[in-house]
Amino acid sequence: MKRTFQPTVLKRKRTHGFRARMATKNGRKVINARRAKGRARLSK
């Protein structure tokens, strides 16, 4: 059985990247929440 996590940088960026987050209203909410919390990394 193959492992479920087969990392691909492009896929990661497209779904969890900064620009992907900024593209939607809820994504912007995520970024703002992480800014308010003081996260060093806002997105992948």
Swiss-Prot record:
PROSITE patterns in the record: RIBOSOMAL_L34
UniProt KW keywords: Ribonucleoprotein, Ribosomal protein
GO term, biological process aspect, one: translation
Domain of life of the source: Bacteria
GO-annotated cellular components: ribonucleoprotein complex; ribosome
Residues in coiled coil: none
GO molecular function: structural constituent of ribosome
Cited PANTHER family: LARGE RIBOSOMAL SUBUNIT PROTEIN BL34M, MITOCHONDRIAL RIBOSOMAL PROTEIN 34 FAMILY MEMBER
UniProt record similarity statement: Belongs to the bacterial ribosomal protein bL34 family.
Protein's name according to its UniProt entry: Large ribosomal subunit protein bL34
Source species: Vibrio campbellii (strain ATCC BAA-1116)
